[in-house]
Amino acid sequence: MATVDVLTSEVVVPAGETPAGAVWLSNLDLAARRGYTPTVFFYRHNGEPGFFAADAMRDSLARALVAFYPVAGRLGLDGDGRVQVDCTGEGVVFATARSGHYALDDLMGEFVPCDEMRDLFVPAAPAAASCCPRGGALLLVQVTYLRCGGVVLGMALHHSIADGRSAAHFVETWASIARGAPAADAPVPPCFDHRLLAARPARAVLYDHPEYKPEPAPPARAATASTYASAIITLTKQQVGALRAACAGASTFRAVVALVWQCACRARALPPEAETRLHSMIDTRQRLSPPLPPGYFGNAVIRTSTAATAGEVVSSPVGHAARRARAATSQGEDYARSVVDYLEGVDAMNLPRSGVSRADLRAISWLGMSLADADFGWGSPAFMGPAIMYYSGFVYVMNAPGKDGAVALALSLEPESMPEFRKVFADEVARLA
């Protein structure tokens, strides 16, 4: 098994004075998955001296933390026992490491999201930091120097304080400072007013929200799987275009997820009468009136889903599955506010977070996020993606770095289903071309 040698590990605090006090967390923050979201960025050496110099990365991180000061805080409790962010300025973890085993091309050839890759390239999460007050640092960073001169930047941001778009906002700001931009000229100033997503005084739950309700114990066949096989699959711009055309012009995310859903049902050999549910997330930022500020930093996504029988998904054209996916992702402000109001009446810290059943799929869109272009002064990443997948039945849809219009999928399925999925998916993509 490959190893890395940790060279340094320290705490980086904001480079200047920051506000004290606390940041109130919304119901969507409390309902987010507990713990961290580990991600990795692979960078090819550009031939310049000082490539990803530790001092430059550390100093720019400290300056970014001035604007994003809650990231340097800790989770705590308010007087009513509600989780909040205490803006203590205690700092974040910053480590450097070296790998004598991996060159970048080797790593890109064998990388799949898994525990081993997370353990190699992302600092270990503090045991008490998942949801407990006075837990550990909310951001963990590691710069690993490969034997070829390339670099893996691994980071894990606590999900209680940021969703994917907010994480991208932080990375974009940090990268701009590393490139030499003044810290005061952040691309978009962050907004930490989470009360913009508070429940309404007169709560109005207008919809059913099964995604936030405890589920009865499923039969053995449908049990969630903590063991999984994962894969990275890339679709070219032409393949994405052909798939969207087959889906009557559906969005890239809906078209890709529709095909993944179909192929997963086939690979899992689900009975035609079995219910299969496609879970997804909706970003509420532009769906509210007025919209959230451009720099809203927190969790602004809500869970949603749509269900069908496996027979319907498999036997219908892929465009039908895309229309189902649209039904799961097209809700507007009324639905979003209904979710927030519903969560006001439940214990948001103890919602179901154990994964999805063996018949289901959870799809997350990272399309359009600046993570794929995170340039710290030495060029954009050759690859960016999640370091782990958590459980079977998970798929991220992302822009493929450096490949205009191409899409990368990070996918996890049951180990026995993955080989058949890869075959069926490749056959379907070839047939569409």
Curated annotation (Swiss-Prot):
<dbReference type="GO" id="GO:0050734">
    <property type="term" value="F:hydroxycinnamoyltransferase activity"/>
</dbReference>
<keyword id="KW-0012">Acyltransferase</keyword>
<dbReference type="GO" id="GO:0016747">
    <property type="term" value="F:acyltransferase activity, transferring groups other than amino-acyl groups"/>
</dbReference>
<dbReference type="InterPro" id="IPR050317">
    <property type="entry name" value="Plant_Fungal_Acyltransferase"/>
</dbReference>
<protein>
    <recommendedName>
        <fullName>Hydroxycinnamoyltransferase 4</fullName>
        <ecNumber>2.3.1.-</ecNumber>
    </recommendedName>
</protein>
<comment type="function">
    <text>Hydroxycinnamoyl transferase that catalyzes in vitro the transfer of an acyl from p-coumaryol-CoA to glycerol or shikimate, to produce 2-O-p-coumaroyl glyceride or coumaroyl shikimate, respectively. Quercetin, glutarate, or malate do not serve as acyl acceptors in vitro. Can use feruloyl-CoA and caffeoyl-CoA as acyl donors.</text>
</comment>
<feature type="active site" description="Proton acceptor">
    <location>
        <position position="375"/>
    </location>
</feature>
<comment type="similarity">
    <text>Belongs to the plant acyltransferase family.</text>
</comment>
<keyword id="KW-0808">Transferase</keyword>
<dbReference type="InterPro" id="IPR023213">
    <property type="entry name" value="CAT-like_dom_sf"/>
</dbReference>
<feature type="active site" description="Proton acceptor">
    <location>
        <position position="159"/>
    </location>
</feature>
<dbReference type="Pfam" id="PF02458">
    <property type="entry name" value="Transferase"/>
</dbReference>
